């Protein structure tokens, strides 16, 4: 039984929604960031870059987060941001050139996270957990929701469809040609239906935002200890999430790029691969895998198809069937000597949306010796691994939609 809760969002006035909201901070190059800050006085980026006009400031994290909080208050005082008077759910739709995503922004329960109603598929880094917890504690808000996915639900789908027939509270297109629409759901009957519908859903799966959710849970635990009148209903007991039906989630694979062959020549490397794979040389013809346990490889000017020898490989449990794990156990670890795939300096990852051409260009540049591609992980595989209480290898999935920051802000 999943707990979802309406909340009073802080958000931009309708005429400034496109100007205030931004892409996630890490998607901006330094040049793009500089341009946004210089020419858009309303962008949320000013809040999270409080010392933009004085780059010489050397601040501790705590002081920087305090300045973020102050800039946030300034945006509210100037009426750039306002807090809704009624608690609501928010239906958000993002339309790209290839996909349309539509789900519900809600407060979700820390208790559900602890009780495994909200399940994760990736591990987190303690250092990042603590950093973001401190950010949340010192700023008092969260501007980027965790992406959760749930099994398709007819009741929720019907409510979303009903609101899509109405005028959106926000409707704008960004320079990347994506369209964004937002509807406010503050009618009591609709709120009750959404709450009841999610009570029938046993599990919500984290698709993106593992550190945000974990940090929110850490913060809730610490604030509860500091509050002698803690009831469990305080806003810090929830975190903002974007709930998206499984059928609308898009999962892409990450390509792997390796800087050296661990002392092997290309021919010796191919010989080592032959233990676990049947190998086809495709020359300059781009090869993309068509089935699970098939891999593409670019080495020494040629594309190769690698087909796993299933009679040799040991399928032990759910995780061992995952292509990213197969590549690690048969190639990256035993042949290329990469033990720690999260932190090893000789491996680089890139999400694959280029039809395989990137496998060639990055190796031909001389920066890498070999590259690998595979089919994307499916939502079915992701759920099987999570339900078996396992974690996926790092950089196994690149999941869309990527959500805008400060379209909706959650205060606690």
Regions found by a protein language model. Give the residues of each.
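Surface-exposed, charge/polar-rich loops and edge strands
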Residues: 1-412
């Amino acid at each position: 039984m999943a707990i979802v809760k309406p909340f009073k969002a802080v958000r931009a006035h309708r005429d400034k929604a496109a100007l205030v909201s931004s892409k996630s901070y890490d998607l901006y190059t330094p040049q793009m960031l500089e341009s946004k800050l210089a020419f858009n006085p309303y962008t949320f980026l000013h809040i999270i870059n409080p010392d933009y006009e004085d780059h010489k400031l050397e601040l501790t994290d705590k002081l920087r987060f305090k300045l973020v909080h102050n800039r946030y208050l300034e945006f509210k005082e100037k009426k750039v941001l306002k807090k809704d008077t009624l608690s609501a759910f928010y239906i958000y739709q993002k339309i790209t050139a290839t996909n349309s995503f539509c789900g519900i922004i809600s407060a979700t329960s820390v208790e559900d996270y602890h009780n495994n109603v909200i399940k994760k598929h990736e591990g987190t880094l303690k250092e990042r957990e603590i950093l973001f917890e401190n950010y949340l504690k010192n700023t008092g808000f969260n501007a980027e929701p965790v992406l959760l996915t749930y099994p398709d639900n007819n009741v929720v789908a019907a409510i979303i469809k009903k609101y899509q027939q109405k005028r959106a509270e926000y409707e704008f297109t960004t320079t990347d040609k994506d369209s964004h629409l937002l509807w406010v759901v503050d009618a009591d009957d609709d709120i009750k239906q959404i709450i009841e519908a999610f009570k029938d859903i046993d599990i919500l799966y984290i698709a993106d935002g593992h550190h945000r959710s974990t940090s929110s849970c850490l913060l809730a635990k610490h604030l509860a200890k500091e509050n002698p009148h803690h009831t469990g209903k305080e806003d810090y007991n929830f975190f903002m999430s974007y709930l998206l039906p499984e059928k609308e989630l898009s999962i892409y694979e990450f390509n792997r790029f390796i800087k050296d062959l661990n002392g092997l020549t290309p021919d010796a490397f191919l010989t080592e691969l032959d233990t676990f794979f049947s190998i086809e040389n495709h020359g300059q013809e781009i090869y993309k895998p068509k089935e699970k346990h098939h891999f593409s490889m670019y080495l020494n000017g040629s594309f190769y198809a690698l087909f796993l020898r299933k009679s040799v490989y040991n399928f032990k449990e759910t995780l061992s069937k995952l292509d990213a794990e197969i590549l690690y156990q048969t190639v990256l670890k035993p042949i290329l000597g990469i033990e720690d795939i999260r932190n090893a300096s000789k491996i680089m990852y890139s999400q694959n949306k280029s039809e395989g051409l990137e496998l060639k260009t990055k190796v031909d540049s001389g920066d890498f010796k070999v590259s690998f591609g595979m089919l994307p992980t499916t939502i079915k595989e992701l759920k099987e691994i999570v339900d078996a209480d396992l974690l996926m290898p790092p950089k196994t999935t690149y999941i869309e939609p990527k959500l805008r920051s400060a379209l909706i802000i959650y205060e606690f």
